[in-house]
């Protein structure tokens, strides 16, 4: 990673491509998922059959793309941003939460500014870990099961296995949708609401040296 003219190169090309494909795929999954959930709803004039086909194709693309994320985080320096540090975790999370709830509106500086060593603040970091390593795999596994229902256990305590799988799939999809909304909002927080969106396009994040605190830990 290189730093130049108060810009930090945080998003390598592979990560930007992955992010773009993932964002488009997730949005399509949400739209088509809503159409499938509410069969009487005419969303974007999309008929049910088209929604099923688009949902399945988008799911396959997001699944294959997920392996790009996993492999990338195994073989590139990007993995360091997802390392869990239990010591002081609660204190860091509470500090960031207080900033979002109060400090942000008082014009206070962010307690965990972006640097070469820290891409995410504590709340972002653990939210991303939950989403990318728990919610997304659950959505993928339940989605595959629904594509091949013969793989699903017939009943669990007299309740249809297909129903339970669909319920879990829909619930995880809802949580990912909520995360996406929060993610977009948080991305707009900063000196300029478009800064973070530019960063994911060109790879560089604008950083102000005075905001850096080398004593802060991730």
Range-by-range predicted roles:
Residues 1-218:
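Membrane-embedded alpha-helical bundles that constitute the cytochrome b-like, heme-associated redox core
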